[in-house]
UniProtKB/Swiss-Prot annotation:
It is an enzyme of class 1 (oxidoreductase). PANTHER family: PYRROLINE-5-CARBOXYLATE REDUCTASE, PYRROLINE-5-CARBOXYLATE REDUCTASE 3. It is found in: Cytoplasm. Keywords: Amino-acid biosynthesis, Cytoplasm, NADP, Oxidoreductase, Proline biosynthesis. The lineage of its organism: Eukaryota, Viridiplantae, Streptophyta, Embryophyta, Tracheophyta. Disulfide bonds: none annotated. This is Pyrroline-5-carboxylate reductase.
Amino acid sequence: MEILPILSDSYTLGFIGAGKMAESIAKGASRSGVLPSSRIVTAHSNPSRRAAFESIGITVLSSNDDVVRASNVVVFSVKPQLVKDVVLKLKPLLTKDKLLVSVAAGIKLKDLQEWAGHERFIRVMPNTPAAVGQAASVMSLGGAATEEDANLISQLFGSIGKIWKADDKFFDAITGLSGSGPAYIYLAIEALADGGVAAGLPRDLALSLASQTVLGAASMATLSGKHPGQLKDDVTSPGGTTIAGVHELEKGGFRGTLMNAVVAAAKRSRELS
């Protein structure tokens, strides 16, 4: 069967699963103008989840079958342990004229393609900062997904942050870094704030300063064009306060601990997939 292109100015996007990630993507797409809410559909039995989508102008249908029938692009955003059963149940409706997308962590592209019965599938790994339009997402293309399909999904996920393309074999490592990474940073923010309190700052000021410092440093690393090591060197004067703090971090194994966290999370992702 010929792979028909999906027209970016007229396609309908359907979500199978109406959780927080689906909501973040839907809001990002509609707010950015990538896709009007009138061309987004989903289904959910929970009144609060229905209301969350209806409040931004999204049509909530009565069943997942109806969502697939109404959609040109179908995004599976259910819990990983449910993906296989959901895809298999919908398989008769998952024709090649529809582009299929999964955002479920740990579910390999080869399995998604096998369950769907065709390879017009794209796997995407976003992360939770999608909720504020700052996701780090990575996609991998199935065997029948076209460059036009990739461009469409890049545009969609670009509305909630940044997206890169990588081979599916890297997704466990991606999970360990950007998938789990926000939790490492939240822990670092909390620790910085606690350090500020220990040094005499009020709690609210310490937390605000810690959060903004991480945000600013991340922006510098992204926008300056400099290696993070160079940025670190730029702020560490000889015999100054910053190098004293960096020395303590090095003595405590700060780098190695972060590296080990990524490796451990990637290993766990492989075990679960």
